Amino acid sequence: MPKLFFALPLPTLAPELAAWRDRRPWPGLPVPEANLHLTLAFLGEADEATQARLIALAGQQHCPPFSVHLDQTGWFQRAKAAWVGPSEWPNELTVLARALRRHGEKLGLGNGEQGYRPHVTLSRKANEAPGEPPAPDFQLEADRFCLYRSVSTPDGVHYEPLACWPLRARPKPAAHPRPDANANAQENRR
């Protein structure tokens, strides 16, 4: 079964991030440019029926578009992953990540982690944190999120989007016209 995760795609930012990483000493094995994404929620393995239910739940999610400033580097020691991410991030990002993680939990998916650290993994098998390069300075304009599956091939792991949704605010309820007092009075006289 494939492993699933929700993420923000980086179609225009991925080439810039890869070029920035490749111009400096960076620990570990580089993540291919095509696999770069900002993780929202890791879900783990899921069968096709669970994938379909997850897609239906995610399609109901509302979140307005937002911006994220990627301005620091970091390292997950246990995962041996070196990354770039924001020092601060908008509440919309936290709310979206939490909601998507809960959708997975409803279906028995996820790893139960409650903390969220937005990041873009730039390398794996990193035995140390990135050095002190000039701080990253990238702006991510998030306008959609996707459900991906991880596919192992002879050339390595590739991430394939199963479904993507635009970020959009919750629609405002339609205003109902107030009943006309005169019309009500006339109705009452009949």
Regions found by a protein language model. Give the residues of each.
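Histidine-dependent nucleotide/RNA phosphoesterase domain, centered on the 2H-phosphoesterase fold
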Residues: M1-R190
